[in-house]
Amino acid sequence: MIEKVPMTRGGHAALADELKKRQSVDRPRIIEHIAEARSHGDLSENAEYHAAKEDQSHNEGRIAELEDKLARAEIIDVSKLSGDTIKFGATVTLIDEDTDKKAVWQIVGEAEADAKKGRISITSPLARALIGKKKGASVEVVAPGGAKAYEITKVEWR
């Protein structure tokens, strides 16, 4: 059975955009670089050629990965979700019980996680600790940096 990859509509669109760019912009540019490097002669000692081939390999690997994720995508429309129990797609506001610092995280699929944008993977230690909890609950998260305790102050669906 094919394992579905849960993702938000926005996450799906971002991956589709990246795929399109890699296929229509990056791939032709890399092919051009390979042809140019090949014209410089002996390929066995041509660093430019080998670098371009490595770029091509990396790009083609990422294209295959994106095609696979998009083919297995299960798009979850977060705007249609509701309730006060945390699950995939929830945007959760937390207060660090040690420092009183506020943090806001949206729980998303692995393919669209980006901590700088406040999006954490559903498989992350924090998301796993939050799933199934409700506003007002305290959670302890054991992560590589050590254990942290948080209070859940808000659960939203954006």
UniProtKB/Swiss-Prot annotation:
Organism per entry: Nitrobacter hamburgensis (strain DSM 10229 / NCIMB 13809 / X14)
Any GO BP annotation: regulation of DNA-templated transcription elongation
Keyword Protein biosynthesis appears in the UniProt entry: no
Coiled-coil features, chain-numbered ranges: 51-74
Family annotation (InterPro entries): GreA/GreB_C_sf, TF_GreA/GreB_CS, Tscrpt_elong_fac_GreA, Tscrpt_elong_fac_GreA/B, Tscrpt_elong_fac_GreA/B_C, Tscrpt_elong_fac_GreA/B_fam, Tscrpt_elong_fac_GreA/B_N, Tscrpt_elong_fac_GreA/B_N_sf
Source superkingdom: Bacteria
Annotated keywords: Coiled coil, DNA-binding, Transcription, Transcription regulation
Family: Belongs to the GreA/GreB family.
ATP-binding found in the keyword field: no
Cysteines joined through disulfide linkages: none
Role played: Necessary for efficient RNA polymerase transcription elongation past template-encoded arresting sites. The arresting sites in DNA have the property of trapping a certain fraction of elongating RNA polymerases that pass through, resulting in locked ternary complexes. Cleavage of the nascent transcript by cleavage factors such as GreA or GreB allows the resumption of elongation from the new 3'terminus. GreA releases sequences of 2 to 3 nucleotides.
Protein name: Transcription elongation factor GreA
PROSITE patterns: GREAB_1
Location of the region described as Disordered in the Swiss-Prot/TrEMBL record: 41-61
A GO molecular function held by the record: RNA polymerase binding
